[in-house]
């Protein structure tokens, strides 16, 4: 089973002991495992192209957020000329080969830890590792790798990735260079993801892990703070495309969203403004305490920034998306 080395273990103890970080040891440890998985995945060769995306990409590649991110997200780009049956077979082969590649790299990936749906267009792998530090409540006990068949809509960037331990200690590392989704596309996808997932709260359903939801809020706010992307009016077209794609993808899981996505997202926007029971605020504070090692806007400020950007996008969209 994958675990960090003795040297890495001692580096973590030194960083925490010297007061160079307030992050729990378990967070730094998992980031090392995440980084090792990224390096291993970079060595995987397949006709399909993998693009690094999501919150971990924002943190480790774009460096626009200063937080621990424990999931690895990728877009898979296949040839557009493939027939549906050939695409399904190619994705199945990629899934199996990638799982074997990770196992050969020392990662514990049981057969039941590999799941796929929608004709293999969505693949999820749960890698198990052995922790040498106390558990952190905000962290899962495994590393989740998620891959979705979808070509990037905008331009990509080639960026290096590092571990938090390497960055904080100044220890030179073997950097992997990844093709990464751009900030604009990630920005829009996270706005839509936050609002869509917030619909659970409007129905009185509490998020099992609210900090999984508020990470989208935090990421959008940090991108907006440092890049002011929300002022780019060209993103309204992208916003509609992402909403429509999500409405198709989640049609069987959320009939209300699929029926009238813009109306549903406006309802979720109001839910953020009201935050009944302060569920989001409490989740945000826990997330900031356990996972963030950089600046942390107060929840009220973060909600205001996110709300303004989301409202501008929603107001630009037709009444029925």
For each feature predicted by the language model, list its residue ranges.
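Glycine-rich beta-strand-to-loop/alpha-helix junction loops that act as flexible
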Residues: 52-56
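Structured mid-to-C-terminal alpha-helical surface segments
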Residues: 1-50, 60-66, 76-321
């Amino acid at each position: 089973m994958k675990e960090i080395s003795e040297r890495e273990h001692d580096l973590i103890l030194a960083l925490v002991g010297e007061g160079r970080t307030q992050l729990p040891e378990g967070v730094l440890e998992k980031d090392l495992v995440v980084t090792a998985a990224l390096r291993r995945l970079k060595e995987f060769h397949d006709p399909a192209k993998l693009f690094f995306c999501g919150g971990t990409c924002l943190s480790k590649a774009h460096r626009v957020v200063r937080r621990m991110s424990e999931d690895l997200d990728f877009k898979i780009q296949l040839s557009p000329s493939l027939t549906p049956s050939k695409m399904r077979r190619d994705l199945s082969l990629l899934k199996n080969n990638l799982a074997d590649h990770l196992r050969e790299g020392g990662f514990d990936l049981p057969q039941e830890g590999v799941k796929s749906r929608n004709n293999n267009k969505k693949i999820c792998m749960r890698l198990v590792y052995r922790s040498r530090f106390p558990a952190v409540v905000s962290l899962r006990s495994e590393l989740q790798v998620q891959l979705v068949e979808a070509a990037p809509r905008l331009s990509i960037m080639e960026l290096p990735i590092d571990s938090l331990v390497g960055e904080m200690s100044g220890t030179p590392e073997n950097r992997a260079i990844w093709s990464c989704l751009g900030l604009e596309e990630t920005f829009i996808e996270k706005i839509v993801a936050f609002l869509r997932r917030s619909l659970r709260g409007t129905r009185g359903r509490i998020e099992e892990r609210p900090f999984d939801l508020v990470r989208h809020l935090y990421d959008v706010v940090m991108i907006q703070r440092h890049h002011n992307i929300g002022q780019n009016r060209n993103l309204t077209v992208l916003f509609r495309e992402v909403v429509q794609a999500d409405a198709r993808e989640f049609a069987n899981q959320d009939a209300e969203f699929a029926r009238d996505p813009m109306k549903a997202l406006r309802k979720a926007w109001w839910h953020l403004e009201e935050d009944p029971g302060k569920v989001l605020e409490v989740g945000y504070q826990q997330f900031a305490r356990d996972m963030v090692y950089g600046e942390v806007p107060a929840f009220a400020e973060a909600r205001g920034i996110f709300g303004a950007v989301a409202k501008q996008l929603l107001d630009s969209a037709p009444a029925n998306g």
